[in-house]
């Protein structure tokens, strides 16, 4: 089973296509609509407004519960939940880190340029860097060195947090890795945007 977590734009054609690619490779792949209670991202043309009116109102706890439900559904519909993984892009990259700490059934995660640190609030009480010590599945972090929203220093901070967790015996933290593509911007996997970079996206 592979859970595919969208960017802030929701499950649009790009995310559907990524999910189909996993399905064609033989996985039961699911891309849940995680913003449905707050609104429809496809109705927004302005990112700042989308962020303010929908994304900021989505609690991490709600997302974790929805993903638990999606995984449970997969188990009842032919999926092997003993071999479950998660991958996500941008907003979904952050969720990938969180879910790899939340659910012990997850065996691996791949986080594409997901935020790892920042200000906390009631809906986002902890970021990945604060959860490194209790990570339950190894995560492969794929990040761009030219990402203006997630600086290389943030990647290095997360590496350090994972190293400290590994030194204290956390096997998932020890097995986690990063690949930093020096010239890649944010959203380098998004093949419908000008940020797309074929080499790191297909590496």
Predicted regions and their residues:
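Short beta-strand/loop motif that positions the catalytic acidic residue
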Residues: 135, 141-143
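Acidic catalytic loop of the alpha/beta-hydrolase fold
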Residues: 146-150
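Primarily recognizes the serine-hydrolase "nucleophile elbow" in alpha/beta-hydrolase
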Residues: 67-134
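Short alpha-helix in the alpha/beta-hydrolase fold that links the catalytic acid
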Residues: 18, 128, 151-164, 177
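Serine-hydrolase catalytic machinery in alpha/beta-hydrolase-like enzymes
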Residues: 1-79, 127, 188-193
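Hydrophobic residues in well-ordered beta-strands that form the structural core
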Residues: 30-31, 111, 141
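Active-site loop/turn elements of alpha/beta-hydrolase fold enzymes
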Residues: 27, 34, 114, 181-183
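C-terminal catalytic histidine-bearing segment of alpha/beta-hydrolase fold enzymes
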Residues: 165-203
């Amino acid at each position: 089973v592979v859970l595919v977590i969208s960017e802030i734009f929701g499950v649009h054609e790009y995310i559907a296509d990524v999910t189909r690619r996993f399905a064609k490779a033989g996985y039961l792949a699911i891309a849940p609509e995680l913003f449905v209670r707050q609104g429809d991202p496809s109705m927004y043309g302005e990112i700042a407004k989308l962020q303010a009116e929908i994304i900021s109102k989505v609690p991490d706890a709600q997302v974790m519960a929805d993903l638990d439900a999606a995984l449970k559904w997969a188990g009842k519909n032919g999926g092997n939940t003993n071999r479950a993984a998660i991958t996500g892009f941008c907003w979904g990259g952050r969720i990938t880190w969180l879910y790899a700490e939340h659910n012990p059934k997850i065996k691996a995660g791949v986080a594409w340029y997901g935020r790892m640190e920042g200000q906390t609030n009631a809906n986002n009480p902890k970021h990945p860097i604060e959860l490194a010590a209790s990570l339950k599945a190894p995560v492969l972090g794929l990040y761009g060195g030219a990402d203006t929203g997630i600086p290389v220093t943030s990647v290095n901070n997360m590496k350090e947090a994972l190293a400290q967790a590994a030194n204290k015996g956390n096997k998932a933290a020890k097995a986690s890795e990063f690949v930093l593509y020096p010239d890649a911007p944010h959203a380098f996997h998004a093949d419908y945007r000008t940020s797309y970079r074929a080499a790191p996206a297909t590496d």
